[in-house]
C-alpha cells in the first residue's frame, strides 16, 4: 500500500513538471517578441490573405497559407516553431518538424504531443555555449583595443599620404614647368645642331664637287696638253727634216766632213728620242710673256739637259701646271738659270729668234695672261688686316662667352654655399636654381654649338625628367591607393600593403586585399580574381574575374571576415565549381557595438540560468 502510494506521487510530480515546462497551447511556438500580435480576438494573417479567430490558433488546422495561425503545430508547411531553450540559445525550426518523433529543441518543446520523451539538455549545451561565448567576449575586448590602435595609426598614415600627395602634385607642377623649359631649349639645341650638320654636309658636298670638277679639269687639261705637245712635236720633226735635207744638198761636196753632224741630226730625229723633243717644246710655252725675245730659245736649249732625268708622269705634271697655275720648284729654278745664262751667251740671239718664230701662235695665245690671273686669285685672300680683324673678333667673343659662363658657375657656387649655411633649401629649390643658371649661360645663337654647354643642358634635362618621372609614379601609386574604401573608420587601411596566405593540401592560397587573390601550386599560379568590393557592411571581401575554369565560369573568391586577435587566413574551400570561400580573422572586425551585444547575451544567459535554478 505504501509503495503504491509513493509511485503514484512520483508520477504526479513528473506530470506536473512536464506541464510546467511546456508553455500554454495558445502561445506554443510563438517568439516572445510576437506574443502581442496574437492577443487580439481576431488575428490577421501576416501575408494579408485572411483573418482567423483567436480560438483557431494552434487548432491543428491551417487557416493562413503562410502558417500564421499554426506556429505550434505541423498543420501548415510554411509555419515556424520557436524553441525557447531556456538556459541555452533559442532557435526557430519549421513547424513541419513538430511532433515528428525527433527532438529538435534542446528543451524538448517541439515533441510535446508525441510518443517520444525528449530530455532537456539545454543546461549542458548552454554551459558549453556560455563558455564559448565568454571566450568570444574576451576576444572581442582585446580585439577592440587592437582595432582602435590600428585605426589611430591608419588615420595618421592616411593623412600623411594625403599630405604627401598634395605636396607631390605641387612639386610636379613646378618641376613640369622646368622640364618644359629645358625641353624647349633642348629642341633649340637639336635644331641648331641639325642646321650645323646640314651646313657641314652641304659644305662637304660642295668641296667634293669642286674637287671632282678640279680633277676633271686637270684631266682635261692634261689630255689637251698632250694633244698640243704631240702636234708641236710633229711640226718640229717636219721642220728639222726639211732643214737637214737643205743642209745636205748645200754641202754635198763636203760629205765626209759633215758626217758626224748628220749622224747627230739623225739621232736627234730618231723615234726613240721623241721624249727629248717633247721636253724641248714644253718650256717654250711655259716662259712668261714679259720675258725678252731671246728667252724661249735659251729655254729650248737648256730644257733637254735639265729634264733629262724626268719621267713621262713628271713631264705630264709639268705641262699640266701651265693649265692649273701651279708652280713647280724645279721649273722655277730652271727658269732662273736660263735668265742668267741669257746674259752670258749673246751670240745665240739669232738662233733664238729663229726658234721663237717656230712656236705656234695658237699655243702662245692660249697661255697668255693665265699665269697672272692665277697669281691674282692666289693672293686674293692674303689681306693681313682682314685675317687679324677676324681673329680678334673671335677671341673677343670667346673671352666674353667664357667670362659669362664662369660668372654663372661662380654664382652657382655661392648659391650652393648659401643653401649649405641655411640648411633650409630643398632639392626642388636647388634644381630650379641650377636650371636657371644653365638657361642663362647657354648661347643659342653661337655657331657652332658649344658641345659642353649643350651637354650640360641635356644633363639637367635628363635629371629633371628622371625626377619628374619618379614623382609622377609616386603620385599615381598614392592616387590609386587613396581612392579605395577602407571602411567607416579606415580600419582596413593597413590591409593595402599586406598579403595573407593559407596552405590547404597541395595548394597555397594568397589573398592581397585591394589587389588580387591567387592559388599557387609549385611554380603554377592561378588567379582567383582581382579586388572588387566589400559586401555585407564590410564583413565580406569580394574578388572577381579570375582565370576562367575549363568549360566553366571565371574564378571568384569571397573572404568572410571575423573578429580575431591576429590576421589569419583559413577555411579555404570550393563549395561550388570555381567559386571559392575563405575566412579571415582580423582585429578590424572586433567592433565595440558587437562587443556590447555579446556582453548582453552572456548576461541574459546567466540571468536565465539563475532564474531557472530558483
UniProtKB/Swiss-Prot annotation:
One GO cellular component this record assigns the protein to is:
glucosidase II complex
Cystine bridges: 499-512, 549-578, 563-590
Instruction: Report residue spans for region: Disordered.
Output: 194-396
Compositionally biased spans, kind Acidic residues: 352-364, 383-396
Q: How does it assemble?
A: Heterodimer of a catalytic alpha subunit and a beta subunit.
Q: Where mainly found? A: endoplasmic reticulum
Q: Which InterPro entries match?
A: Gtb1-like (IPR039794), Man6P_isomerase_rcpt-bd_dom_sf (IPR009011), MRH_dom (IPR044865), PRKCSH (IPR036607), PRKCSH_N (IPR028146)
Q: Where is the MRH domain?
A: 497-592
> What subcellular compartments does it reside in?
Endoplasmic reticulum
The identity of this protein, by name, is Glucosidase 2 subunit beta
| Record key words, sorted | Disulfide bond, Endoplasmic reticulum, Glycoprotein, Plant defense, Signal
